[in-house]
Regions:
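Exposed, low-structure sequence patches enriched in small/polar residues
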Residues: 1-163
Length: 163
C-alpha cells in the first residue's frame, strides 16, 4: 500500500517571463498537473504465486482558467502564462481558484505471470477517468473516458542484474 498527497499553490512553477518557467517542451517539470491543484494518490499491489493485481486511484481538484471573453484572468494553473499579467487578485489566493475542476482516475489491472525468466504476463486492465469542471467552457468541459485492455507483455531483454 502506498499513499501520497500533493498540493501546489497557484502560480508555482510559472514566471513573469514564461520562457524561464519550470517547464520544458510545453510540459511542467515540477508536476504533470502544473500548478493550482491538490491530489491524493493511493496504490495497492497484490501478488500470490503467479497471480497479481494492481490498483491506482487518483482524486484531486485543479483550478483552471475560464478563457472566455468575460473572464480571461490567469488563475495560476497554466505555468506558461506570465504570473504578473491578468491576475484576478494579489492576496487571498487559494488552491483551486478559478474554474475548479474535480478529477478522478482509477486504474485497475490483474494478470498472470506466464514465464518468470522473461517476465511474460497475460493481463487485463480497466481505466476510468472523470474530469468535472464547475463551468463548461470551449476549452474545459465535463468528460469521462473508460478503457478496457488485455494482452501479453514481456521484458524480452531483461538485463537487470543485482550483484
Amino acid at each position: 500500500m502506498q499513499a501520497e498527497y500533493n498540493i501546489v499553490r497557484p502560480y508555482v512553477y510559472s514566471h513573469s517571463m514564461p520562457i524561464t518557467n519550470y517547464g520544458h517542451s510545453n510540459q511542467s517539470m515540477g508536476h504533470p498537473w502544473g500548478g493550482n491543484f491538490q491530489e491524493l494518490l493511493a496504490i495497492a499491489r497484490y501478488h500470490k504465486g503467479r497471480l497479481y493485481a494492481d490498483a491506482k486511484i487518483t482524486v484531486g481538484t485543479k483550478g483552471l482558467d475560464y478563457n472566455t471573453t468575460a473572464n480571461d484572468y490567469n488563475y495560476g494553473g497554466n505555468i506558461y502564462k506570465d504570473y504578473d499579467e491578468k491576475r484576478p487578485y494579489d492576496s487571498g489566493v487559494t488552491v483551486g481558484q478559478g474554474n475548479k475542476t474535480n478529477i478522478f482516475i482509477a486504474d485497475l489491472q490483474a494478470g498472470y505471470l506466464i514465464n518468470p525468466m522473461t517476465n511474460m504476463k497475460l493481463f487485463g486492465s480497466f481505466i476510468y477517468r472523470n474530469f468535472d469542471p464547475n463551468q463548461n467552457t470551449t476549452t474545459v468541459f465535463n468528460e469521462s473516458t473508460t478503457w478496457f485492455s488485455f494482452g501479453v507483455r514481456s521484458d524480452v531483454f531483461n538485463w537487470y542484474f543485482d550483484y
